[in-house]
Amino acid sequence: MDQFIVSVVRDIQDIAALCRQYDIQIRSVYIGGGTPTCLPIAGQETILQAVAGNFREIEEWTVEAGRPDTAGEEVLALLRRYGVNRISVNPQTMQQRLLDLLGRRHRVEDVFDMFSRCRKMGFSVINMDFIAGLPEQTQADMQENMEIVCQLHPENVTIH
């Protein structure tokens, strides 16, 4: 894992050098495309330090926190400390039977808890990811997902 962190930091530094060379200002940063919060917290902090140290004009900084089992208070506090203001909570579905079928390690209740923690910790924009077309998923399941979205009021919703 350490080599992965080193490679990510090197990529951040290389991109920052190119941005300086071509006078490009990065205003939006997205760390995701997976679940970066599953990395050891020291590795997460190393990546956050690299971003914060190389890009000082960030207006929107997103981290894909993914599953509730990877983003406890310590991780969320770390993200806020570095200025992350947009977070993606990715329940994928709000039906426990489908989460179990997918092998997800969280419960539906954990998503509600994580969403509430994110709000309390000051994340100004919360995105939620859902997947349409899961095995055994019904139209009623998707309807229920959207009803929950309406209750929680995330600023963004992504449906894959």
Spans of features found by a protein language model:
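Conserved non-cysteine loop/helix-boundary elements of the Radical SAM core domain that shape
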Residues: 1-18, 26-160
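A short alpha->loop->secondary-structure connector
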Residues: 22
